From Swiss-Prot:
Species whose genome carries this gene: Mus musculus
The protein's name in its UniProt record: MOB kinase activator 3C
Keywords annotated in UniProt: Metal-binding, Zinc
Gene that encodes it: Mob3c
Record-linked Pfam families: Mob1_phocein
UniProt binding sites for Zn(2+): C82, C87, H164, H169
Family that this chain belongs to: Belongs to the MOB1/phocein family.
A GO molecular function held by the record: metal ion binding
Free-text function comment from the UniProt entry: May regulate the activity of kinases.
SUPFAM superfamilies hit by this protein: Mob1/phocein (SSF101152)
InterPro entries in UniProt: MOB_kinase_act_fam (IPR005301), MOB_kinase_act_sf (IPR036703)
Length: 216
């Protein structure tokens, strides 16, 4: 029998500290609206649509932070099964290998272990979310012109976490009775990125068959 989400994903398993929205802000109200829709049992395709009169950048920002929290929690639960020895390369099966590149330590694409890649990824996303120039939280402060491009890069890299977890650690998901919860999170993520064309279709190829099966 599948366990409830709180039982499956213990809070102390979070890979990085959970990001929260400031109460009283527009972003917080949007987050509450999105969560209420999720809990209402509405079709996930409907849940991700931009509410009338709302800013698309605010809507995307709320979801990027929420997906970061959720995927961070999923990977944190799997992390003990994802080691330097078990996953020496960040990959999605034999056909897909993901290399890390940033503006600091790895200026050229680097072949890294999955846990090292994940640690760098979560640090990188956390830095962007905490950067007021990228994710402004003050009323009246506009988003940067390249905001959606930044979010595309974040979401593309988060999708790779799903790829690695599904292909290399699905047995762990099953053993915890977490399949339904991870699938729901994936479907929510997938419908969102499709709704706003935020991830290149080629990036989705590793999970195409599974996606066609569960996101029909």
């Amino acid at each position: 029998m599948a366990l409830c989400l709180k039982q499956v994903f213990a809070k102390d398993k979070t890979f990085r500290p959970r990001k929260r929205f400031e109460p009283g802000t527009q972003r917080f109200e949007l987050y509450k609206k999105a969560q209420a829709s999720l809990k209402s049992g509405l079709d996930l395709r409907s849940v991700v649509r931009l509410p009338p009169g709302e800013s698309i950048d605010d809507w995307i920002a709320v979801h990027v932070v929420d997906f970061f929290n959720r995927i961070n929690l999923i990977y944190g639960t799997m992390a003990e099964h994802c080691s330097e020895s078990s996953c020496p390369v960040m990959a999605g099966g034999p056909r897909y290998e993901y290399r890390w590149q940033d503006e600091r330590q790895y200026r050229r694409p680097a072949k890294l272990s999955a846990p090292r890649y994940m640690a760098l990824l979560m640090d990188w996303i956390e830095g962007l979310i905490n950067d007021e120039d990228v994710f402004p939280t003050r009323v009246g402060v506009p988003f940067p012109k390249n905001f959606q491009q930044v979010c595309t890069k974040i979401l593309t890299r988060l999708f790779r976490v799903f790829v690695h977890v599904y292909i290399h650690h699905f047995d762990s998901i099953l053993s915890m009775g977490a399949e339904a919860h991870v699938n729901t999170c994936y479907k929510h993520f997938y419908y969102f990125i499709q709704e706003f064309s935020l991830v290149d279709q080629r990036e989705l190829e590793p999970l195409r068959e599974m996606t066609e099966r569960i996101c029909h």
